[in-house]
């Protein structure tokens, strides 16, 4: 698995330490092991997890600004845990409403000794942002409209941002953004060995 990860990182032009590579592989091992009992992801093959979960998460890292982030609807920790591994100087709150997912996140935190994550079981609209976050991240969580509606209290103003990971660019969602936000930028992402388009939509709270 290490060779596969090395090849993917090289193809993406991402440089991380051996320790970070080992942590990413440990995380995939744990996800694969827990997935058999808890059904945390539809991806069953660890090699595919490297592409569709690890690489698909960490290609976002250069585009994040700030130090405090919240990953809403994180599921088994995506993209929050891979981002926390490759960005150790930032802190990531990992929010999910399902207990089994949060139990997994806490086990990952313990086994990988990740001091820069905080797993939280809560519905996003009930979670207090005190203080507000530099970035609100979502991946496969909701439409842009719902994300803004549920998470509007979370980002700092005016500097905070919403970061939504999307596949094909959702033109219809972008044309019907709710009041209170505006489009900051759209970044086309390149994920080695992943078919289909990937985009990062960055929204700015007004």
Curated annotation (Swiss-Prot):
One MF term in the entry's GO annotations: rRNA (guanine-N7-)-methyltransferase activity
Location (main, coarse): cytoplasm
GO CC term, one of those recorded: cytosol
Catalytic activity: guanosine(527) in 16S rRNA + S-adenosyl-L-methionine = N(7)-methylguanosine(527) in 16S rRNA + S-adenosyl-L-homocysteine
Compartments (UniProt record): Cytoplasm
HAMAP family: 16SrRNA_methyltr_G (MF_00074)
Family as reported in the entry's similarity comment: Belongs to the methyltransferase superfamily. RNA methyltransferase RsmG family.
NCBIfam families: rsmG_gidB
Full protein name: Ribosomal RNA small subunit methyltransferase G
Species assigned in the record: Pectobacterium carotovorum subsp. carotovorum (strain PC1)
Gene: rsmG
């Amino acid at each position: 698995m290490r060779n596969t990860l090395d090849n993917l990182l090289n193809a993406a032009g991402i440089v991380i330490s051996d320790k970070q590579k080992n942590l990413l592989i440990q995380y995939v091992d744990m996800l694969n092991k827990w997935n058999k009992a808890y059904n945390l992801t539809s991806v069953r093959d660890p090699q595919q997890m490297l592409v569709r979960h690890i690489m698909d998460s960490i290609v976002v890292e250069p585009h994040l600004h700030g130090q405090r982030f919240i990953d809403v609807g994180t599921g088994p920790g995506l993209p929050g845990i891979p981002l926390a591994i490759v960005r150790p100087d930032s802190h990531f709150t990992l929010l999910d409403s399902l207990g089994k997912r949060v139990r997994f996140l806490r086990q990952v935190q313990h086994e990988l000794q990740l001091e820069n994550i905080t797993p939280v079981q809560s519905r996003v609209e009930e979670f207090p942002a005190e203080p507000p976050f530099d970035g609100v991240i979502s991946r496969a969580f909701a439409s842009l409209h719902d994300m803004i509606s549920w998470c509007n209290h979370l980002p700092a103003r005016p500097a905070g941002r919403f970061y939504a990971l999307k596949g094909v660019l959702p033109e219809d969602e972008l044309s019907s953004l709710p009041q209170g936000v505006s489009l900051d930028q759209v970044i086309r992402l390149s994920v080695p060995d992943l078919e289909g388009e990937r985009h990062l939509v960055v929204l700015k709270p007004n």
